[in-house]
Amino acid sequence: MNYSDKYEVLWATPIRTATRSCKPIQKYFEFDVIGEHGFQIPKGKEEYFFVLNTRNPYTRMISIYHLFCVHYKLIPNNFNNWIRKKLYEEIKFPGYTLDYEYFIKKRITKTPDLLIRVESLYSDILKLPFFMDNSDELFDIVNDNILKNAYSSGYNYKEYYDQDLANYVYSYLEEDFVYFNYNKDSWKNGTP
């Protein structure tokens, strides 16, 4: 987990939650990088303001599918089969890849002070406690990186999900939906 002693902030960026967009901001503020996707709170930093990036679980599953399958040319027969297999594996090895709310409850007893949602990345980043105290230069850094790595679901949920698969994903990741306040039926309108 990345942190800043100067601002007393911890910032966790789980896999597929805009890490590339947030890293230059962390660099600008001279955060120490302990692990891009790690959840371990460094000793003595337990009381720091805790920022956590999050993403709609439906979109996150599609993004992970593309990361692990398409990018590495390990394309299974289809998303439906792949996600069912991965979620089943998650039962055997909890917290491995898909269910990151698990990490928070099992490894971190601290509730996030600020959620940065991938779907509202720009406006949420502006809520960082140290943001308003800094120069306009930061606006350029945020704009450049958010635009460069712009969140675009780029995915039409209806191409990936039907009611049966959405129910299946929700049944495994219900705690993520509830904890991070994402709508169970968000896949129905096609995009998050």
Language-model segments: which ranges?
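Membrane-interface amphipathic segments in extracytoplasmic regions
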Residues: M1-P192
